[in-house]
Amino acid sequence: MKMTLCNTLPAYPNFVEGIRRAPDRGYTLTPAQTATALKNALRYIPTEFHEQLAPEFMEELRTRGRIYGYRFRPEGDLKAKSIDEYRGKCIEGKAFQVMIDNNLCFDIALYPYELVTYGETGQVCQNWMQYRLIKQYLEELTQDQTLVVESGHPLGLFRSRPDAPRVIITNAMMVGQFDNQHDWHVAMQMGVANYGQMTAGGWMYIGPQGIVHGTFNTLLNAGRMKLGIPQDRDLRGHLFVSSGLGGMSGAQPKAAEIAGAACIVAEVDAYRIETRYEQGWVGHVTDNMGEAYRMAWEAMQQDEPCSVAYHGNVVDLLEYAERENISIELLSDQTSCHAVYEGGYCPAGLTFEERTRLLHESPEKFRSLVDISLRRHFEVIKKLVARGTYFFDYGNSFMKAIYDAGVREISRNGVDEKDGFIWPSYVEDIMGPELFDYGYGPFRWVCLSGKHEDLIKTDRAAMECIDVNRRGQDLDNYNWIRDAEKNRLVVGTQARILYQDALGRMKIALRFNEMVRRGEVGPIMLGRDHHDVSGTDSPFRETSNIKDGSNVMADMAVQCFAGNCARGMSLVALHNGGGVGIGKAINGGFGMVCDGSERVDEILRSAMLWDVMGGVARRSWARNEHAMETSETFNKTHGENYHITMPYVADEKLINKLITEL
C-alpha cells in the first residue's frame, strides 16, 4: 500500500461566486516560524512540485492567515452521496466519507473552501491535502485497522481488530502551558493544530438540526421555570430575542417556532439570513427594528408562532427595546464568542463587510471595538434584566468575553471568573438539572443510504421506543419526533436529532440495528453532539451546574472518550475548546455504524449505557439531586453488571456551624 497525494498537480480551482469565504485569520509568524509552516505544508507534496507550490502556500499564509491548499480541493459541491457510491474495503470507511462530505457541502458548511463547518472556526481538518489523504485512507481501511487522525493530519493506518474503533481523532490537544489563544493561533498558522469545535472535526455535524432540539428544550423549560407556563402548554404569546443565524445559532428561530414563541434573532451577515430564510428556518426578514418588534407583537396577540430575522446588530436591537420600553421575556445570545476577536462577534457600529475588512487591515482596532461593543451589550442586558427579562448565556463564552473586555462586575465574586457569572448559563439553570442530570442528551442518527423513506421509518421506530408516561421529558421528546417530519428539519443528508437518556438511546440503537439486519433500511450512523451528559467538561457550559469544585476538571470527557474506545465505537474523537474556546473545554464524541451485525449489538449494549451513565455518575457524585436519583435507580435495575458510587450528603447545619466558627 502506498499513499501519495498526487502524480500531477491539480488545476487551481474556480471559486463559486456567492459561496461564503472565511476572513483573513491574521499572519503573525516570525520568519523562522514561517519557514517551518511552509515546510510543514510541503511535506504532503512530492518534492518535484515544491518550487511551484511554495510561493502559492506563502501567499495563502500571508493573505488568509492559514495554508489551506486550495489547489487540492475537489471541484464543485461536496454533497454527501449514498454510502453505496463511495469506494471502500469496509462499511465504516465508506460511512465516514459520507459524514465528511456532509460537513463540507455548500448547504451545510459555513466556509466550505476553508473547511469550516460551523462556529466561525470549526474545521473538519486544516487543509485540502489532509482531506485528500484522509479520503484515500478511508478507501483502504479494513476491519483489522484503525485510522489515527491528529489535528486533521492522518497519521496512518495501524493494525487493530474488528471490535476496535476504525477511526480515532484528536483535535487541538495542546500541552497545558501552551493551551491559550496566543499559542494556539501560532500553532494553527504553522499547520499543527486544528480547531475541530465539536462535530466539525468529529465528522458528525447534521446541519442546524443538530442543535434545534436542544434549543427547543431549553426555551420550553425556560418558559416553564421562569414564566410559569404549565407542563402541557408551549410558548405562545411570549417573546424570545437573541442573535446569530450561523451553523448552530441558526437553530434558534426554528426551535422558537416549534415551541410556539414569537422570536426575533439579530444577524449582521445578510448571507446567513438569506440561507436560513431559503431553508425555511426563519419566517420573516427585516432591517427595521420597529417592524421586527411589531411583527413579533402581532403574532403574540394572536397566540401564533413567529420568527423574525433582524438584519443588524443585536446591541442596537436591545437598546431600541430598552428605549421604547418593549418587554422581552426570554433573552440570550449565540454569537461565536469563543472566537470573539477572530470575527465571531461583530462590534456595534460596523457592518459585516466593515468587520471583515477591519479584521484584515487592523486586528488591534477591531479588538478594541469588540471590547467597547461587549461593554455596551452588557449594560443594556443589565437594564433589561432589572425590568424583568430572563437572560441566559447560551454557552458561547459570551459572559467570559464580557469579563475579558474588562467588565469585572459580571463575575459572581467580583474578582475573577472562578465562581461563575451573575447570570446563569442555560446548562446551569435549565439543561443541566432538567436534562443532563437525568441522562437526556442530543442523540442523533444519519441514514447512510441517503433515502428519505429510511428517515421516516427510523422516526417511527424511535417514537415507538419512547414511554410517554415515564417523565415529562419523555413526552416532550415523543412530541418532538412525532412532528419532526412536519417541521422540515433536514439540511444536508437524511439525519435526525432526538434527545434521549441512556436506556432510550440503547433501545433505539438496538432497534435500528435490527431494522438494518432485516433489510428494512440501509446502514445507519449513530452519534451525538459532544455537548452532552458525559462528552464535555467545561465550567463555562456543560459542567456549569456542577458545584463541588470539579467543574474545572476534564476527567469525565477523557474517560468517556477512552471508554468508548475500549468498547469499540466505530469512531471516537477528543477535542480541545468545544463551543467555548481553546483552553475552556475538553470535549469528545463518537460515531457508531449500524451494519445489522450481532457484533454491533454487543457494542451497543455496553457502549451506549457507558457513554451516558459515566456522566450521570459524575454529576451524582457532585451531589446533583436528579443525577443522584437517576444513579440510584440505575444501581437497582442494573446491579448485576454495574454499580455507581453514591455520595453521602453532609448536613448543611453541621457544615455551616463549623464555617461560622472559623
What residue spans do the PLM features occupy?
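Structural alpha-beta junctions
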Residues: E140-Q145, G260-A261, S327-L330, K383-Y390, ...
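Core active-site phosphate/anionic-ligand binding loop and the adjoining beta-turn-alpha structural block
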Residues: G290-I508
